[in-house]
Regions:
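Acetyl-CoA-dependent GNAT
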Residues: 3-63, 68, 103, 122, ...
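Conserved active-site tyrosine of GNAT-family acetyltransferases
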Residues: 17, 109, 114
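Conserved short alpha-helix immediately C-terminal to the canonical SAM/SAH-binding motif I
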Residues: 80, 104-105
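Conserved GNAT acetyl-CoA-binding A-motif
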Residues: 88-101
């Protein structure tokens, strides 16, 4: 047996491990992962905001949300989130999840109805990572 520790793994080695986990998991749940992105551009076609995420297992997972500093506090981030949530519901999602750091937008997400389900302190020695959930079911 040979055990290797590396910070420069071969792409095929990483892909193999991921594929094996997915193969095992597929016995229990159908994998239906699809990208879901929303982009906002100004009149010149310059990106001023964007959301990247995916839907899978009836969940919307928001990975990144960004709005250019000049366009913050204008409601743009809320529009991006609403569009993503609406599309996720059309795809059959019942829940949404995301995480954010203490120096990012915890209060913003809470105003949108996200509830903290956990947190981990100590990132970079001083920051906390917050994990949030929101039900996308009507009336919930």
């Amino acid at each position: 047996m040979n055990i290797e520790l590396t910070d420069t793994p071969k792409d095929q080695d990483e892909a193999f491990v991921i594929a094996q986990v997915q193969k095992y998991s597929s016995r229990f749940i159908v994998r239906d992962q699809r990208s879901l992105c929303v982009f906002a551009r100004d009149g010149n076609g310059i990106m001023i905001g964007g959301l990247t995420g995916r839907t899978n297992w009836q969940f919307l997972e928001v990975l990144f949300l960004w709005v250019h500093e000049q366009h913050r506090k204008t409601g743009l981030a809320s529009k991006l989130m609403a569009m993503a949530e609406s599309e996720a519901i059309k795809r059959g999602c019942k829940n949404a999840r995301l995480d954010t750091f203490s120096f990012q937008a915890l209060g913003f997400y809470q105003k949108l109805g996200y509830q903290e389900v956990g947190h981990l302190p100590g990132f970079g020695g001083q920051h906390t990572r917050h994990f949030l959930h929101k039900s996308l079911c009507t009336g919930a």
